[in-house]
Amino acid sequence: ILGPRGLMPSPKTGTVTKNVEQAIKDAKRGRVEFKVDKAGNIHMPVGKVSFDKAKLLDNIYAAIDAVVRAKPPGAKGQYVKNIALSLTMSPSVKIDINETLRKLQERAA
C-alpha cells in the first residue's frame, strides 16, 4: 500500500541513509527532490505564497540551475524546452525560457 504511493523510506529517494548527520544538514538547507513524469515534465516546489518576490526568484533560478546541471552528458539538443509555474491546483503561467536561461547565466557570472 505505501510503496506505490511513494511513502515507504527508500535509499533511492534519500530517506534511508547511513550518514544521518549529512541527511539532517541537507534537510535543514532545504534540499528538494524533483520528480519527472512519463511525459518528461519536472514537478518541484519552489516556494510558498508567503515568500517575497526576491526569495521566489532565487528559488526559481536555483531550481532551473539544478535541472540544467543534472543534464546527462549524453543528452543532445535543448534540455529545457519550456517552463511553467503554477500554484497547487491552479492554471500555469508560461515563462520565457531564453530570457530565464540568459538571466541564470548572468547570475552565475
Swiss-Prot record:
Q: This chain belongs to which protein, by name?
A: Large ribosomal subunit protein uL1
* Recorded GO MF terms: rRNA binding; tRNA binding
Q: What is the lineage of its organism?
A: Bacteria, Pseudomonadati, Aquificota, Aquificia, Aquificales
- The organism's superkingdom is given as Bacteria
Region forming the signal peptide: none
Family indicated by similarity: Belongs to the universal ribosomal protein uL1 family.
GO BP terms, alphabetized: regulation of translation
A Gene Ontology term for the protein's cellular component: ribosome
Q: Which UniProt keywords apply?
A: Repressor, Ribonucleoprotein, Ribosomal protein, RNA-binding, rRNA-binding, Translation regulation, tRNA-binding
State whether keyword Ribosomal protein applies. yes
